[in-house]
Curated annotation (Swiss-Prot):
It comes from Pseudosoriculus fumidus. It holds the Pfam family Oxidored_q3. Belongs to the complex I subunit 6 family. It catalyses: a ubiquinone + NADH + 5 H(+)(in) = a ubiquinol + NAD(+) + 4 H(+)(out). Its EC number is 7.1.1.2. Keywords: Electron transport, Membrane, Mitochondrion, NAD, Respiratory chain, Translocase, Transmembrane, Transmembrane helix, Transport, Ubiquinone. This is NADH-ubiquinone oxidoreductase chain 6.
């Protein structure tokens, strides 16, 4: 069941990035980034990194959404161009979407000799997503996530905070007209 969930979330992740890259207006690009950020956090949550998924969700979608709101308000068009207005972009997007759906249906519900297999070996994913506590199972994953964020991931907190402050200062200078 988890393989199906990760496959569906990965498909939505790819489709949202295709929608972001084929944006005709800044508003639709931001929507694609919001969807891809939320789905990416869902993938991390599915692998057991609940605190990491929550932190990325709060930092990315909370902080950068403010910057996105200011910048789209400054670049707002009265009648924004939509994906339908450019037939080539729309047909390319739809063709990629249909192709990916057909491929996923073929791989997941295919014949007996064609089975969907995960090629990568995920034996050491504990080092990637969650802070591995070893044999001491008495600690909560949430508390270990906080400890890992502020001990091993202090650079992430510093870089995230600094980049958010820089973005807000730049947006404030742009909106004031300087």
């Amino acid at each position: 069941m988890m393989t199906y969930i990760v496959t569906i979330l990965s498909t939505i992740f790819v489709v949202s990035f295709v929608g972001f890259s084929s944006k005709p207006s800044p508003i639709y690009g931001g929507v694609g980034l919001i969807v891809s950020g939320g789905v990416g956090c869902g993938i991390v949550l599915n692998y057991g990194g609940s605190f990491l998924g929550l932190m990325v969700f709060l930092i990315y979608l909370g902080g950068m959404l403010v910057v996105f709101g200011y910048t789209t308000a400054m670049a707002m068009e009265e009648y924004p161009e939509v994906w339908v207005s450019n037939n080539t972009v729309l047909l390319t997007f739809l063709l990629g979407l249909v192709g990916e759906v057909v491929l996923m249906i073929y791989l997941l519900l295919g014949e007996e000799e064609v089975k969907f297999e995960v090629v990568l070996n995920f034996n050491s994913e504990g080092d990637w997503v969650i802070y591995d506590t070893g044999d001491s199972g008495m600690f909560s994953e949430e508390a270990m996530g906080v400890a890992a964020l502020y001990s091993y991931g202090y650079w992430l907190v510093i870089v995230s905070g600094w980049s958010l402050v820089t973005c807000i200062i730049v947006v404030m200078e742009i909106t004031r007209g300087n």
